[in-house]
Amino acid sequence: MRSVRFLAGSFLALFLVGVIVALPGAALPYWRERYGTEEGASLYFAALLLGLLLGVRLGQQERRHPLLPLALGLVGLAFLGLPFAPSYPWMAPLAFLLGLGGGGMNVHGNSLVGELYPERRVELLNRVNVAFGLGAVLTPLALGSLPYAAFLALAGLLAFVTSALVLGAPPAEKPKERPRGALWPFLLAVGLYTGLEGALATWNRVWLEALGHATALGGLLLTLYWLFLALGRLLLAGRVAKDPLRALRGLLLGVMGLLLLNFLPQTALLFPLAGFLLGPLFSTLFALVQARFGHRALGGLMYAGAAGSTLIPGLFALLPDRGIPLGLFALSLALYLLLRGAEREVVRA
């Protein structure tokens, strides 16, 4: 029963991480109306990032109790406090708490599942990460129908309930033997993956408009892209678990095919399907690093993911519109070749 309780707690913790990520975009209209211009929101994002970096660092510690329940408690307090913040500067410390708690929740929420079910690590980590997508998708929908304060009160209450569910969670396991092989190919792969995922979500809409498609259609396809990303994690988990790196390379071949079709006006509309094939990549790489290198390596994985998701989409801003599909294809090809190298590294070790 304890393992089921911890599994439920991990699922809800990752759901709340999705809420944290989606909250600024979903709440921005309310913030603009209450606080005025959007320029002050930079304080929120800076504090959130600072808290996230520290939270991931603390999450590298093997001691899961009381760190994970405390992280959830801090997030609950931040959610409850946000409606009472009179200005952006007052929101900043609450954003710091969201980042601090969210970083620890992301590391331990994932790693706990992998340790509870090591023989099904790849499959269950993919499926439990569907929770993140649900949180990110439901946040704007909920804020469209609920008052801002009511939604945050519910989110805060859920964080406290989840904190109770993970009380007494066991410490992270140390590797039974010294890790063999290089970690860097896996870190670089995660950075390229998050960069590709973010660049597709941010810039392919611009490319569709350059091809003559309506802005509204681009928004619909972007929603489908995120939906397919979650479905890929859910539906492909069992297949990927049988031979993870080989399966990921096969999925990337499909992604490259779709990104070649992305050059043409009509077939470019198929790009959301790339989300379905990309879905299992992050959780599978997380599972492989956890099994091979242990819990302390997971912080580096999270930092690599954060760097890729920030830097690579930013570099796409330097490309002309016609360079967007070429850049996306080049990223997918580089990731495919890197995974081939990682597979050879595993065989040698």
Question: Which role fits each region the language model picked out?
Answer:
Residues 74-86, 254-264:
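C-terminal ends and interior cores of transmembrane alpha-helices
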Residues 43-59, 223-235:
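Central cavity-lining transmembrane alpha-helices of secondary-active solute carriers
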Residues 24-25, 182-230:
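Extracytoplasmic gate region of multi-pass secondary transporters
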Residues 149-166, 324-340:
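Symmetry-related core transmembrane helices of the 12-TM Major Facilitator Superfamily/SLC fold
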Residues 96-130:
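Cytoplasmic helix-loop-helix junction between adjacent transmembrane helices
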Residues 294-320, 328:
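A late C-terminal transmembrane helix in Major Facilitator Superfamily
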Residues 104-117, 279-293:
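Intracellular juxtamembrane helix-capping segments at the cytosolic ends
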Residues 246-285:
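C-terminal transmembrane helical hairpin of 12-TM major facilitator-type secondary transporters
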